[in-house]
A protein has these predicted regions:
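Hydrophobic alpha-helical segments, chiefly the membrane-spanning helices
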Residues: 1-317
Length: 317
């Protein structure tokens, strides 16, 4: 199959993943609302996990196909890209406010879980099922933390639940769930197959394709959400969404994947893991030292320069 066709299939796969996740979340959330499940529970489970569905589907599919470098590359690459590129672009457009709990708790937590992921993976070269359970226990603890914040009236994903509309029958919503789920599964298969073929065509490693193209594709929803929030003046949402996404990527995506099938964590990810930890630390320092505890334009420029340097390192490596 030609390289051009594989590139088209990769784009199609990304579209299927993103649209499938949207439909699945909408259908599942609205059905849950119909059955009287509290908004806060829907927001912290269906909505929050659904937004990480593209990363999870690609990572699980890649691991099952024996392409573990795409699995880890997707997560590590997405987390680096989310901060350096997405927050970099957004903060250059408009300085980003950061909530107190995000600066004091969530960003440090990102640094901690990123370091834990690197330790678990590099200690013996595998994220085992036991490691996956450990990550999931931490994920549950994070959900409890978000639940407590929401009960205190602090904005979280619990506020992003789709509202029921006239004509939202159970049958219609079930179709959204089934079609959305099918698109996620099919889209992940198309994406992984196309990404693997492209890597072979260019003589690239699956690690490189996972850290770059696949990571960028699965991070598109975060890019759109953050830039839109910044432009609309809801800048505090932008940083919160990215930080939450990075935590979910490690604890939910890698944790779930490892429980299903142990994931090989190649030694080649050592530098990338260090960069991922440093990236989260850079976010903390940039906000902590920023005027009025904001991620300023200067901070955004530093992040974009850092992303450019890392990208050049990947291409040369």
């Amino acid at each position: 199959m030609s390289l051009f066709l594989q590139l088209i299939l990769l784009v199609v796969g990304f579209v299927m993943l993103i649209k499938g996740a949207d439909w699945f979340v909408e259908g599942a959330s609205k059905i849950a609302s119909k059955f009287g499940i509290p908004q806060i529970v829907i927001g912290l489970t269906i909505v929050a996990m659904g937004t990480s569905a593209p990363e999870a589907a690609v990572s699980i599919t890649a691991a099952l196909k024996g392409s573990a470098e795409i699995t880890i590359g997707n997560v590590v690459g997405s987390n680096i890209l989310n901060i350096l590129l997405i927050l970099g672009i957004t903060s250059v457009i408009i300085p980003l406010s950061v909530k107190k709990n995000t600066l004091n708790i969530e960003i440090p937590f990102v640094i901690i879980v990123t370091a834990i992921l690197a330790f678990l993976g590099l200690k013996d070269g595998t994220i085992s099922r036991l490691d996956g359970i450990i990550l999931w226990l931490m994920f549950i603890a994070f959900l409890v933390y978000l639940f407590i914040l929401s009960k205190k009236g602090i904005d979280t994903d619990a506020d992003d639940v789709p509202e029921l509309e006239e004509g939202d029958t159970v049958f219609k919503l079930l179709i959204l769930i089934v079609v959305g789920g099918a698109l996620i599964i099919w889209g992940s298969d198309v994406t992984v197959n196309a990404a693997t073929a492209i890597a072979r065509s260019f003589g690239w490693s699956e690690r490189l394709i996972g850290l770059t193209i696949v990571a960028f594709g699965t991070s598109l929803p975060e890019l759109i959400t953050s830039v839109t929030a910044g432009i609309k003046g809801k800048s505090d949402i932008a940083v919160g969404n990215i930080v939450g996404s990075n935590i979910f990527n490690i604890l939910f995506v890698v944790g779930t994947t490892a429980i299903i099938t142990p994931v090989v964590y190649a030694s080649g990810f050592k530098i990338d893991s260090i960069v991922c930890i440093a990236t989260a630390a850079l976010l903390f320092i940039s906000v902590f030292l920023g005027k009025d505890k904001k991620l300023t334009n200067n901070g955004g420029i530093v992040m974009l320069i850092s992303f450019g340097a890392y990208f050049m390192y990947l291409l040369r490596g």
